[in-house]
Structure formats: structure tokens, C-alpha cells
Amino acid sequence: MKNTLLSLAALLLLSGAAVAQQTKKDTVFFEDFNKKSLNRSKWNVEITGNTVNNEQQAYIDSAATLYFIDGKKEGAKNGALVIKAIYKPGHTSKEGKKYDFVSGRINTRDKMMFTYGSASARMKIADGAGLWPAFWALGKGEWPDCGEIDVMETVGDGSWISNALHGPGYFGDTPLAHREIFLKGTDVTKWHVYSVDWTKTSLTFKLDGKVTYTVTKPMTEKYGRWAFDNPKFLILNFALGGGYPNGVNKVTRPYFGLSQSSVDKIKAGNAKVYVDWVLVTK
């Protein structure tokens, strides 16, 4: 109980500190989603026609999958972004591919690119086998040479999240990955601050301000080139099923990596990711 109370206190401090950061000189980017629509000067909405990783959703630009609420009733400081997965059988992409699910994905490519500093987001996430939301960063160019920083991923087991790096020689089932177990009494369905501190020689991941995993330049160079000296953009998305979830839950039906109970949660309208704010500092 003591650990839980300490974590809650730390989380409240982090939340307030982040909101205060928007007026400080070291703030590169701040978004607290307090409007009724997405700020398109800061964010791009992705529309996909061909998915990767055997994921089961298409990403669309719709107020059904990306919308905003008065976040206070959900525990957010001001407004909150909601990324919602929807069961929509027969959805056809512009390439003619059919999907049973649609969801949302946004990024800051060419609108906010940063090199080094700290990136963080306060999020609350639905759990369920195969629900795969993420907060991450990519460089421009071909993957994996561009470098990928997975600040937070979860594939439906609410008791843990993962951090990872992908680059040339260490991608896919990357050796540079860590699974962080939540303290007793909390899980992904509660509000947490997920962050990474990025320097010229290391990346340090944090959960509610606590260091969970550190990767150094020499660690990556055991496998390939250090791919973290170039500008990156942020991504928030909510994927469904696919290779990573299947590797954990071994589910193949009714959908690859996505369980029936999670499908039921999507159909009931309860598969949602809440984002209170996103902050980048130098």
C-alpha cells in the first residue's frame, strides 16, 4: 500500500510539473489536448491501406476513432485525446484491402522533429489480449536504419509495458528491449507517465519518473550502427493484433494476436486509449 501511495503522489507531481512546463524555456513541444479538435499544425493523422506486422486494423481519419473529451472526469488535467478502436466489418481501404477494425494513429512528422532531450506522455489504456497501443518515435528514411524508439508499448497484459530500440542489426525481435512490471495495485488501465531521456550516447526509459531501462551507444554497437543521432518525430497509435501480441498471447483466432474477449471489448465500445498530454523538452 505504501508503494502504491508513493507512486500516486509521484504521478500527481509529474502531471502538474508537465503542465507547468509549457511556459518554460526548455519546452520544445507541449500538447494537452484541451481543444475540441486535433491541432493539425502539430499533428498528422495517418490513413493506412496496407498494414504491417499482421495487424488487424486500418487507420482512418475520423472523429469516431480520434476525438476529445473533458478529461477531468477521467482523471486528466484538462482535455484528453481518445483513440478508440471500432469494429467495422467490411471496411475497405483505398487499396481495396478489407478490414474488420478501424483505429487511430497520429504523428508529428515534419511538424515537430527533435534530436536529444526528453519526451513524455501521460496515458490511460484499456487492457485485453491483442490490444496494442504505443507511444514511440521514428526518424525519417528507411526503417530500421532511421532508428525507432519505443517509449511505451503494451499488448494487452495490463501488468506490464515494454521499452525497445530498433535500428540496423537490432530490429524486429530486437535484443534491446525490456519488460517493466507494474507495482502491485496498479496497471496500464490507470494513469501513468511514460518517458524517455535521449542523449548523444544513451536512451533512458522511465515509468512515472522511475528509470526502467537504459541503453547506451556501445550496447547498440554490438549489433549495428547507433541510429539515434538524427531527428525523430513522435507517434501515438492503437493497433490490434499482429506479430508482437501473437508472440505473447499465442492467439490465432478469431484474429491473429487478438482474442475473442478483446473483440468483445471493442464491439462494446470499451477499447480506448486516453492521452492527457505530450511533452518534449530539450
At which residue positions do the language-model features occur?
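GH16 jelly-roll
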Residues: 21-282
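Bacterial Sec-dependent N-terminal signal peptides
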Residues: 1-23
